[in-house]
Design a protein with these regions (language model features):
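Residue-level signal for the short linker/turn that defines the boundary of a DNA-recognition helix
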Residues: 11, 21-22, 48-51
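Short polybasic/polar patches that bind polyanions
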Residues: 14, 18, 29, 58
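Short alpha-helical DNA-recognition segment
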Residues: 21-40, 55
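DNA major-groove recognition helix of helix-turn-helix/homeodomain DNA-binding modules
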Residues: 51-63
């Protein structure tokens, strides 16, 4: 069974959001999560899940 790593990427997520010119509410709507969850992610109070990382990549066409 593979061990999962916990990944915190708050500052990078915040920088990406700002570079895209998005508010937390807009990004949350795009990713189908709550704005408060975006805020928690950006403050490193929640880890970035693999599912959410994939949604970010698909939604914003990232490699």
């Amino acid at each position: 069974m593979a061990k999962e790593r916990t990944i915190y990427m708050g500052p990078r997520l915040k920088r990406l959001r700002r570079e895209l010119g998005l508010t937390q509410a807009t990004m949350a709507d795009d990713l189908e999560i709550s704005p408060s969850y975006i805020a928690l992610l950006e403050r490193n109070q929640r880890p970035l899940t693999a599912d959410l990382l994939l949604r970010l990549a698909r939604t914003y066409r990232m490699d």
